[in-house]
Regions:
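Propeptide (latency) domains of metzincin metalloproteases
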Residues: 94-102, 106-140, 144-156
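Primarily the internal scaffold of c-type cytochrome electron-transfer domains
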Residues: 4, 12-86, 94-96, 118-124, ...
Length: 356
């Protein structure tokens, strides 16, 4: 159905949600949605191979990445158009292109901390690889809907029409067509609230958490078609996720739910993701999250209170939810590893200097 139908009644929420990382996690390419620079001198990514560099160009027909190979005396190039932007830009962006009905990732991404272009995460630096397929599980966490085309050749075939970019209302509230039709049929009546729509806040705690866990619960193993999960249904019917106590690598990228469930805060209360997160508006300030901590905790109970005093109220999370290098989002820049730093959701006391 799309968000436009929701705006008819929920304009204020729609306006604030449009600025969130969830909503912006995939977009069509424009001069505003692509954060990388296309101006001369800022549109080149050199590599450790002196015979290879990448050039990013903005043309009337779109935005492009070109691999330039020197094989003296000839120069060879491969150019592909940026068709989809993924990533809100909080950490960075990567770019996808269509080849027929197949989706692939481009070799150059944008890294926000560096304010520049970089080799896409997981790619070998100094290699022009345009052939990494985009699988359904990737799209599930960066879009609202894509329709797969069954193929024995590969999993990255999709219909090029009807897809919905960004995480829209229906990913968390379920299909909205029946709800919208019902409300439109009674324009003078008081809103029915939850008629034919899912309000995650009204779900049992486990089902609430699973709405977030469909993307923030780790990669998991799909056991149902992509985009078939409906909020309120048991997530275990759609994807098998690692148990929060499993003795396995827990990475801060895409596994925030398991880390939260290991936390004493979670296990000794009825806390959910929305206890701390306002999902309909952008929130980034440490003090904002610290206010949530102080709804349950007293500042004087913190071991650092004697040293810092009331100032400690401004930032609980840097000590108790420290930023951690991701093991999965790693790029290579001229032989140096560049890792995304993401907030660890295992809430606890970390001894000074301990690497979480």
């Amino acid at each position: 159905m799309g968000d436009a139908a929701c705006q008819e009644c929920h304009q204020e929420i729609s306006n604030t949600y449009a600025r969130t990382a969830h909503h912006l996690t995939s977009q069509l390419p424009t001069k505003d949605s692509i954060l990388g620079k296309f101006t001369s001198g800022q549109n080149i990514l050199m590599t450790s191979d002196p015979d290879l560099h990448f050039r990013m160009d903005a043309k009337e027909t779109g935005f492009y990445e070109t691999g330039v190979f020197w094989q003296p005396p000839d120069q060879k190039t491969r150019t592909e158009r940026i068709d989809i932007v993924t990533g809100s830009g909080d950490k960075g962006q990567t770019y996808l292109y269509w080849k027929g009905d197949q989706l692939f990732q481009l070799p150059v991404s944008y890294w926000t901390d560096l304010k520049g272009w970089i080799t896409s995460p997981g790619y070998s630096e100094g290699v022009a690889d345009f052939d990494r397929p985009i699988l359904p599980r990737c799209l599930e966490c960066h879009a609202t809907y894509f329709e797969s085309i069954p193929s024995e050749k590969a999993e990255n075939y999709y219909k090029k029409t009807g897809f919905v970019l960004g995480i829209s209302c229906e990913r968390c509230h379920g299909p909205g067509r029946a709800h919208a039709q019902y409300e439109r049929s009674r324009p003078d009546a008081v809103s029915s609230g939850g008629h034919s729509i899912v309000n995650p806040a009204s779900l049992p705690r486990e089902r609430q958490i699973e709405v977030c866990a469909q993307c923030h619960g780790g990669i998991g193993q799909p056991i149902a078609p992509a985009f078939s999960y409906v909020p309120g249904q048991p997530l275990e019917n759609y994807v098998t996720l690692p148990h929060p106590d499993a003795d396995a690598r827990v990475d801060v990228h895409g596994n925030q739910v398991a880390l939260t469930q290991r936390s004493r805060c979670y296990r000794s209360s009825q806390m959910t993701c929305t206890t701390c997160h306002e999902v309909h508006a952008p929130e980034r300030a440490a003090a904002t999250y610290s206010e949530k901590c102080l709804q349950c905790h007293q500042d004087r109970d913190c071991g650092e209170f004697v040293k810092l005093g009331a100032k400690i109220r401004e930032n609980c999370i840097d000590c108790h939810m420290p930023l951690q290098d991701s093991k999965l989002i790693v790029s290579d820049l001229n032989g140096e590893q560049v890792k995304a730093r993401i907030r660890n959701h295992w809430i606890k006391v970390y001894p000074a200097g301990q690497n979480p």
